[in-house]
């Protein structure tokens, strides 16, 4: 878990004992293992040099395509800021597997989440507060919902007639599914996981990305490395496969494409006219959100709702910009 938001950090610490944990991701590229995000070690290892920070900056300037003044997509963004070689090695194949699209079909903003560091810092996240729940996220969520005012019903899908049972509904399901996909299905990605059992260590780290398009999975997670305070001889790993989300699959994250915005805008326009309902979360607002942002927006939404009750104002269908 990682965030710069102290309010969010305090919130999760109310429900879980957060242990110190720094996520350090490795990547297998052409038979070699590199550190991510791209840092000084990655640059020196990849190009077979021993650059200082200033030398590495100059090297990347030589590699970058500075003729691209205003990148219009992911690929152009990468070519302008890291150059063709690093883009081809670390991002092109991985991006195609993760999104099911060529990088030229994705917005440039997707790559802005991935930094390049001119030092040897291999902390994947550059956030003030970082940790992991000692007893896992399941325990944390269980602690959140164990409240006298909360009733959890499993294996029950939302139905429109349920709205009459409540003064206000907060809907975190898929936006198009709320309307039974009347205008067509929005695009999502889903994930498949293949378990690997090993009697020893499997890869020696928590996360190993596989950047080549020739390898069908995007990464392997070795779970005992997420809890280094525990001791395990054997190991459980999961290969992660990303694919298009079909109607009966669990949607993991939305794919916002510039050429599909007309369909999304139909749903957003209709949703904004709704009364007594607020759409929230990754699926409800159709945005790719990290966990800390999702929690921050949920807390903000709760505050807006309480204020609307106090001031007897109408609660909006969205409390964030969509």
Residue positions per predicted region:
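C-terminal lid/capping helical subdomain adjacent to the catalytic/cofactor pocket in oxidative enzymes
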Residues: 154-155, 167, 187-198, 206-207, ...
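Mid-domain catalytic core of redox enzymes
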Residues: 156-266, 270
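Alpha-helical packing segments of well-folded alpha/beta enzyme cores
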Residues: 4, 8, 74, 91, ...
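N-terminal FAD cofactor-binding segment of flavoenzymes
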Residues: 1-32
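Conserved beta-strand segments of alpha/beta enzyme cores
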Residues: 17, 149-153, 276
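Conserved beta-strand termini and adjacent loop/short-helix elements that scaffold enzyme active sites
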Residues: 21-23, 153-157, 223, 280
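Active-site/ligand-binding neighborhood in enzyme catalytic cores
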Residues: 27-168, 172
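Structural/interface elements that position substrates and couple domains in central-metabolism enzymes
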Residues: 10, 14, 86, 203, ...
């Amino acid at each position: 878990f990682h965030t710069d938001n102290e309010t969010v950090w305090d919130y999760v610490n109310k429900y879980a004992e957060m242990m110190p944990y720094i996520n350090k991701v490795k990547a297998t590229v052409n038979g070699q293992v590199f550190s991510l995000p791209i840092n000084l070690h990655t640059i020196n290892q990849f190009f077979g040099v021993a650059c200082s920070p200033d030398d590495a900056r100059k090297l990347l300037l030589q590699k970058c395509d500075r003729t691209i003044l205003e990148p219009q997509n992911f690929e152009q963004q990468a070519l302008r800021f890291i150059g063709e070689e690093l883009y081809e090695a670390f991002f092109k194949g991985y991006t195609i597997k993760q999104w099911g699209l060529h990088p030229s079909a994705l917005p440039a903003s997707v790559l802005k989440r991935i930094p390049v560091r001119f030092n040897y810092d291999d902390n994947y996240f550059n956030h003030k507060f970082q940790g992991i729940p000692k007893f896992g996220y399941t325990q944390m969520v269980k602690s959140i919902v164990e409240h006298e005012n909360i009733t959890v019903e499993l294996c029950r899908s939302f139905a429109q007639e349920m709205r009459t049972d409540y003064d206000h509904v907060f809907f975190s399901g898929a936006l198009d599914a709320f309307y039974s996909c009347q205008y067509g299905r929005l695009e999502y990605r889903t994930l498949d996981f293949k378990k690997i059992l090993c009697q020893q260590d499997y890869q020696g780290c928590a996360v190993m990305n596989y950047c080549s398009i020739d390898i069908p999975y995007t990464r392997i997670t070795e779970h005992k490395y997420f809890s280094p305070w525990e001791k395990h001889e054997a190991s459980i790993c999961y290969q992660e496969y990303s694919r298009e989300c079909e109607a009966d699959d669990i949607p993991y994250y939305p794919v916002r494409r510039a050429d599909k915005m007309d369909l999304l805008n139909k749903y957003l326009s209709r949703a904004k006219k709704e009364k007594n309902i607020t759409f929230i979360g990754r699926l409800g607002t159709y945005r790719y959100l990290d966990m800390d942002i999702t929690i921050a927006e949920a807390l903000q939404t709760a505050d807006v709702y309480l204020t609307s009750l106090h001031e007897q104002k109408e609660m909006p269908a969205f409390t964030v910009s969509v």
